[in-house]
Design a protein with these regions (language model features):
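A short, acidic/glycine-rich surface segment
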Residues: 57-63, 134-136
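Core segments of cupin and vicinal oxygen chelate
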Residues: 7-58
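Mid-chain, well-packed structural core segment of small domains
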Residues: 74-93, 97-98
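N-terminal beta-strand motif that seeds the catalytic metal site of vicinal oxygen chelate
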Residues: 1-18, 73-78, 129-136
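Residues that cap or flank secondary-structure elements
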Residues: 7-8, 81, 108-109
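Vicinal oxygen chelate
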Residues: 39-40, 90-136
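Alpha-helical elements of the RecA-like P-loop NTPase motor core of helicases
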Residues: 17, 59, 87, 124
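Short, flexible turn/loop "capping" segments at secondary-structure junctions
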Residues: 66-70
């Protein structure tokens, strides 16, 4: 197996492209000029996020698209290097039109996390972990 990437359905490619750029995701230069899809590179290892119009995603998966207003199909986690990075992402998400469903806060005494929904309701979380405080 060479690599893994995440495909998500979106209702508006251009709006989603703008949202993910505004929150700091790096556009994948391989697909930067495409109008029928969008692609971003996330993190130090360039994890690939692919965004497809709902009709294309439905064709690929041969099933209905999840209604994100009624439930979550997945929670995508992003690893932060500092608490400040968590706070900054929450601010960027709000400014870009996303919904922060869990404000930045401490969790279990060793994590600092926030959660947000993108423009299509896909749920994401960012957390900073203080491993030296993690219960043994």
């Amino acid at each position: 197996m060479k690599s893994v990437w995440l495909n998500l359905p979106v209702s508006n490619i251009q709006a989603s492209k703008a949202f993910f750029k505004q929150i700091g995701f790096r556009e994948n230069p391989m697909h930067a000029q495409a109008d029928h899809m969008a692609s971003f590179l996330i993190g130090e290892n360039d994890f690939v996020l692919m965004l497809f119009p709902e009709y294309a995603f439905q064709h690929f998966t041969q099933t209905a698209i999840s209604d994100t207003s009624k439930g979550s199909e997945v929670l995508i986690n992003l690893d932060a290097q500092t608490r400040m990075e968590v706070d900054e992402l929450a601010d960027k998400v709000k400014k870009a039109g996303g919904k922060v469903f869990a404000e930045p806060s401490e969790v279990d005494g060793w994590m600092y996390a926030m959660g947000f929904a993108d423009l299509d309701g896909h749920r994401w979380a960012m957390l900073y972990m203080e491993m030296d405080k993690m219960p043994k």
